[in-house]
């Protein structure tokens, strides 16, 4: 009778006769590691011994397969090999099946593996090119030619005669006298004032000394000597009466900072340019003394400058124009601006279907030292755009009929990632000081004015100013001229960042102008034309040919071009190109991409599980020695790793319980010890809980 209480100490290698082979036995291999699990009671013999089957009872049943309820919710493959084999057998990607079907031919397997990897590389290289093109945000320019009625643009015409205001008339006359005296001192030029004033005028030094920053003739210093590198910017040598040598002198005036620690000369090689800039500098100071509310102009209304005005063969009226004053270009009149109740529309092209003006261009000699051009200044612009006469205007010549033909062009650009433009200027870090919509020129002038106010403490008179800020005047800000010319030099070099801050608008409308000139009026017709103009306007034209000019502005054609940008590569086209490349190299669909994603996910999960098992086997496995024995004794059987084959606990088989059938006794002859070995016994399949040793990987 077997002693079941000693079973855990047995370490016998059994050799059971499980076959009818001539040798009658099968030997197992010796175990290299002692089994820590106690053996279960024997419930039967091996299937190979028929005699013992009949003696011991019926054959044990086959191991029960797990049902769906007992299977894990999510199962993964046991190894990478099994995963890749399953993928190659079931994927819809062309060529993958060849890796499995040709596994018995290593050369074919290697060939298809290399070909498959090269195909993947080529495809993803094409993918990289497609993504690079998409994220470069290219645009396509679409050109559309449209034909329709067109809104006539706004037209601004200026007299080119800066006007003398009543409030500053005496100051301007004093400036004229000082300028003429300066010309006499520097060039011995006798103007009408110097010839008529005679002894009534003050002495030269008294008259010029009353005005700061006098105009001087400066001798150009020699080239700088390295031994004298610490010369200041005001190193030009002043000489009131040097010998005139064009290679050795310049004309200019000195400007200094607040504490006179830094000075420089604003010089010009041309005396005409120097006199005009010097006069302009003092003229700006005088204009700054005007009140904020513009005074009434002494000049007569529109009829004193514009003899005739017609649009589409209909006469103009006072509601068709607005008036403002420009410091350099005099009185200006804007036709068809945004304040016009009914904007002019052009339904036909040609000179007879546009704006026709007859202008008076006689020079009234208001400020001859400031205005040296005769004629008129004209600019074509949008209704909601200010007229920057310095930037976009052109001059009309007296005695000439100037015909300006226009072509409208519209440009719609893409902003955001596709281009550096702004929709309405709200995202531009510059405050719009003009009562108009955003344009790039509006932003640039506003940016300069902001820097002028910030660094010089006053506003430049040519640009609008915010409330609470005064225009620059050297009687209040003595060093504003020094600050202004320094700032102007930095502005020209874009050191202020105005050109980079002020982005172009996304929607721009331009008018392409073409000019034609002809003599007007002709010799045969000038007598009656001048006579009619004089009678009509109650004004006698003294210098007939230089006293009038004709201006025609019209659309050359009603066809206008619209240039619009659109993305060259959209998300739809990108996906289409990616799908085309995928189909080209693998002949697959979107579901194949999902299969690839599933493969990558399975690889990551299997790797994570294997790392977790390695971590647990390294840090949580039972130790060796007495400490390990205690840990094993105190560890529940269910917590052992699968290699320890834990079995469910049951009462000792040596003590049968009442009401139950005692276990069968082992009546087989004892095994031959010469054939002892760790032969796998079929009894293990009938042992409850033996499925815990299965290597399946499940969650």
Curated annotation (Swiss-Prot):
<dbReference type="GO" id="GO:0005886">
    <property type="term" value="C:plasma membrane"/>
</dbReference>
<feature type="site" description="Cleavage by Furin">
    <location>
        <begin position="205"/>
        <end position="206"/>
    </location>
</feature>
<keyword id="KW-0968">Cytoplasmic vesicle</keyword>
<feature type="region of interest" description="Disordered">
    <location>
        <begin position="211"/>
        <end position="244"/>
    </location>
</feature>
<dbReference type="GO" id="GO:0097228">
    <property type="term" value="C:sperm principal piece"/>
</dbReference>
<keyword id="KW-0969">Cilium</keyword>
<feature type="compositionally biased region" description="Low complexity">
    <location>
        <begin position="656"/>
        <end position="667"/>
    </location>
</feature>
<keyword id="KW-0407">Ion channel</keyword>
<dbReference type="GO" id="GO:0008217">
    <property type="term" value="P:regulation of blood pressure"/>
</dbReference>
<keyword id="KW-1015">Disulfide bond</keyword>
<feature type="topological domain" description="Cytoplasmic">
    <location>
        <begin position="1"/>
        <end position="110"/>
    </location>
</feature>
<feature type="disulfide bond">
    <location>
        <begin position="158"/>
        <end position="332"/>
    </location>
</feature>
<dbReference type="GO" id="GO:0005272">
    <property type="term" value="F:sodium channel activity"/>
</dbReference>
<protein>
    <recommendedName>
        <fullName>Epithelial sodium channel subunit alpha</fullName>
    </recommendedName>
</protein>
<dbReference type="GO" id="GO:0006814">
    <property type="term" value="P:sodium ion transport"/>
</dbReference>
<feature type="disulfide bond">
    <location>
        <begin position="443"/>
        <end position="483"/>
    </location>
</feature>
<keyword id="KW-0406">Ion transport</keyword>
<dbReference type="GO" id="GO:0006883">
    <property type="term" value="P:intracellular sodium ion homeostasis"/>
</dbReference>
<dbReference type="GO" id="GO:0098719">
    <property type="term" value="P:sodium ion import across plasma membrane"/>
</dbReference>
<feature type="topological domain" description="Cytoplasmic">
    <location>
        <begin position="611"/>
        <end position="699"/>
    </location>
</feature>
<dbReference type="GO" id="GO:0050699">
    <property type="term" value="F:WW domain binding"/>
</dbReference>
<keyword id="KW-0894">Sodium channel</keyword>
<feature type="compositionally biased region" description="Low complexity">
    <location>
        <begin position="227"/>
        <end position="238"/>
    </location>
</feature>
<feature type="transmembrane region" description="Helical; Name=2">
    <location>
        <begin position="590"/>
        <end position="610"/>
    </location>
</feature>
<feature type="region of interest" description="Disordered">
    <location>
        <begin position="1"/>
        <end position="71"/>
    </location>
</feature>
<keyword id="KW-0812">Transmembrane</keyword>
<dbReference type="GO" id="GO:0070062">
    <property type="term" value="C:extracellular exosome"/>
</dbReference>
<feature type="region of interest" description="Gating release of inhibition by proteolysis (GRIP); protease-sensitive region that is responsible for the proteolytic activation of the channel">
    <location>
        <begin position="200"/>
        <end position="270"/>
    </location>
</feature>
<feature type="disulfide bond">
    <location>
        <begin position="256"/>
        <end position="263"/>
    </location>
</feature>
<keyword id="KW-0739">Sodium transport</keyword>
<dbReference type="GO" id="GO:1904117">
    <property type="term" value="P:cellular response to vasopressin"/>
</dbReference>
<keyword id="KW-0813">Transport</keyword>
<dbReference type="GO" id="GO:0005829">
    <property type="term" value="C:cytosol"/>
</dbReference>
<dbReference type="GO" id="GO:0001669">
    <property type="term" value="C:acrosomal vesicle"/>
</dbReference>
<dbReference type="GO" id="GO:0016020">
    <property type="term" value="C:membrane"/>
</dbReference>
<keyword id="KW-0915">Sodium</keyword>
<dbReference type="InterPro" id="IPR001873">
    <property type="entry name" value="ENaC"/>
</dbReference>
<dbReference type="GO" id="GO:0050915">
    <property type="term" value="P:sensory perception of sour taste"/>
</dbReference>
<dbReference type="GO" id="GO:0034706">
    <property type="term" value="C:sodium channel complex"/>
</dbReference>
<dbReference type="GO" id="GO:0005737">
    <property type="term" value="C:cytoplasm"/>
</dbReference>
<dbReference type="GO" id="GO:0071468">
    <property type="term" value="P:cellular response to acidic pH"/>
</dbReference>
<keyword id="KW-1133">Transmembrane helix</keyword>
């Amino acid at each position: 009778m077997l002693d079941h209480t000693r079973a855990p100490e047995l370490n016998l290698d059994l050799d059971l006769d499980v076959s009818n082979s001539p040798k009658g036995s099968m030997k197992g291999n010796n175990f290299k590691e002692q089994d820590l699990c106690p053996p279960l009671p024997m419930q039967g013999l091996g299937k190979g011994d028929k005699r013992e089957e009949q003696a011991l009872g019926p054959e044990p049943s086959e191991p029960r397969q797990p049902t769906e309820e007992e299977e894990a919710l999510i199962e993964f493959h046991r190894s990478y090999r099994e995963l890749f084999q399953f993928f190659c057998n079931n994927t819809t990607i062309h060529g993958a099946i060849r890796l499995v079907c040709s596994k018995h031919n290593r050369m074919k397997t290697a060939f298809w593996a290399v070909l498959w990897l090269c195909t993947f590389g080529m495809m993803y290289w094409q993918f990289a090119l497609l993504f690079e093109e998409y994220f470069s945000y290219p645009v396509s320019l679409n050109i559309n030619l449209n034909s329709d009625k067109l809104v006539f643009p706004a037209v601004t015409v200026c007299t080119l005669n800066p006007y003398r205001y009543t409030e500053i008339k005496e100051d301007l006359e004093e400036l004229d006298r000082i300028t003429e005296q300066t010309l006499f001192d520097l060039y011995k030029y006798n103007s009408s004032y110097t010839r008529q004033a005679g002894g009534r005028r003050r002495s030269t030094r008294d008259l010029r000394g009353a005005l700061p920053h006098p105009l001087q003739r400066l001798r150009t210093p020699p080239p700088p000597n390295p031994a004298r590198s610490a010369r200041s910017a005001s190193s030009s040598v002043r000489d009131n009466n040097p010998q005139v040598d064009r290679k050795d002198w310049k004309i200019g005036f000195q400007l200094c900072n607040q504490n006179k620690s830094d000075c420089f000369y604003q010089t010009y090689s041309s005396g005409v340019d120097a006199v005009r800039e010097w006069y302009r500098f003092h003229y700006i100071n005088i204009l700054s003394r005007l009140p904020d509310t513009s005074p009434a102009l002494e000049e007569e209304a529109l009829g004193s400058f514009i003899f005739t005005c017609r649009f589409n063969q209909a006469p103009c009226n006072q509601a068709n124009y607005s008036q403002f004053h420009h410091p350099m270009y005099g009185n200006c009149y804007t036709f068809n601006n945004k304040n016009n109740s009914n904007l002019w529309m052009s339904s036909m092209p040609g000179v007879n279907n546009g704006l026709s003006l007859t202008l008076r261009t006689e020079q009234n000699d208001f400020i001859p030292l400031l205005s040296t051009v005769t004629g008129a200044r004209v600019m074509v612009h949008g209704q909601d755009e200010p007229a920057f006469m310095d930037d976009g205007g052109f001059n009309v010549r007296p005695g000439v009929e100037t015909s300006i033909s226009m072509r409208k062009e519209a440009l719609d650009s893409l902003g955001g990632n596709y281009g550096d433009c702004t929709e309405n200027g709200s995202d531009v870090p510059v405050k719009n000081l003009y009562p108009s919509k955003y344009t790039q020129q509006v932003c640039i002038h506003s940016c300069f004015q902001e820097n002028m106010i910030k660094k010089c403490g006053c506003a430049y008179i040519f640009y609008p100013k915010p409330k609470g800020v005064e225009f620059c005047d050297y009687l209040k800000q003595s060093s504003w001229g020094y600050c202004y010319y320094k700032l102007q030099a930095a502005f020209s070099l874009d050191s202020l960042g105005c050109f980079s801050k002020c982005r172009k608008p996304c929607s721009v409308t331009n008018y392409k102008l073409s000019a034609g000139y002809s003599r007007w009026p002709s010799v045969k017709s000038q007598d009656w034309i001048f006579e009619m103009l004089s009678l009509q306007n109650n004004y006698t034209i003294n210098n007939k040919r230089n006293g009038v000019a004709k201006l025609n502005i019209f659309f050359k054609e009603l066809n206008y071009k619209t240039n619009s940008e659109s993305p060259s590569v959209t998300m739809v086209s990108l996906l289409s190109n990616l799908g085309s490349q995928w189909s080209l190299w693998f002949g697959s669909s979107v579901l194949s991409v999902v299969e690839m994603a599933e493969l990558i996910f399975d690889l990551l999960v299997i790797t994570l599980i294997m790392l977790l098992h390695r971590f647990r086997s390294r840090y949580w496995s039972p130790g060796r020695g007495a400490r390990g024995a205690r840990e094993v004794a105190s560890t529940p059987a269910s917590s052992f790793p699968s290699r320890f084959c834990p079995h469910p606990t049951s009462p000792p088989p040596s003590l049968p319980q009442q009401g139950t059938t005692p276990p069968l006794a082992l009546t087989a002859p004892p095994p031959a010890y010469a054939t002892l070995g760790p032969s796998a016994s079929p009894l293990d399949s009938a042992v409850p809980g033996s499925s815990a040793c299965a290597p399946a990987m499940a969650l």
